[in-house]
Amino acid sequence: MFKISKEFSFDMAHLLDGHDGKCQNLHGHTYKLQVEISGDLYKSGAKKAMVIDFSDLKSIVKKVILDPMDHAFIYDQTNERESQIATLLQKLNSKTFGVPFRTTAEEIARFIFNRLKHDEQLSISSIRLWETPTSFCEYQE
């Protein structure tokens, strides 16, 4: 079995309502995302000797993750304060992305993993999500 990975970069704003530090304030990150795929090689056809064509992986991640999330305010739809901020931003024609969980690196990594594995049927082995150049979370099942 082979493992291949591709890295992506995107920017998002968020806050962690109720956090006991600076992250309770609205702030942003340049996230680095590493998507790792595992599998056997195609035996024939245009993709012969590949696990997945890197350009196909790039297109899927762009469509499912980057296009909706890049330069958005990601917020917890179950949190009143974050939802109010999102409503204001939407009225000002700013991009938002709502999720039903607290927007920690850990939960975002799990969300991305599940979106790619279950929604797109990719054989994801792990997701790494860097929130800063020195801090990342890895999620795998």
UniProtKB/Swiss-Prot annotation:
Record's keyword terms, sorted: Lyase, Metal-binding, Queuosine biosynthesis, Zinc
Domain of life (superkingdom): Bacteria
Free-text cofactor note: Binds 1 zinc ion per subunit.
Record-linked PANTHER family: 6-PYRUVOYL TETRAHYDROBIOPTERIN SYNTHASE, PYRUVOYL TETRAHYDROBIOPTERIN SYNTHASE
Keyword Secreted: no
GO molecular function, one term: metal ion binding
Active site feature: 23, 71, 131
Stated name of the protein: 6-carboxy-5,6,7,8-tetrahydropterin synthase
Annotated TM spans: none
InterPro entries per the UniProt record, alphabetical: 6-PTP_synth/QueD, 6-PTP_synth/QueD_sf
Family: Belongs to the PTPS family. QueD subfamily.
Catalytic activity: 7,8-dihydroneopterin 3'-triphosphate + H2O = 6-carboxy-5,6,7,8-tetrahydropterin + triphosphate + acetaldehyde + 2 H(+)
Pfam families per record: PTPS (PF01242)
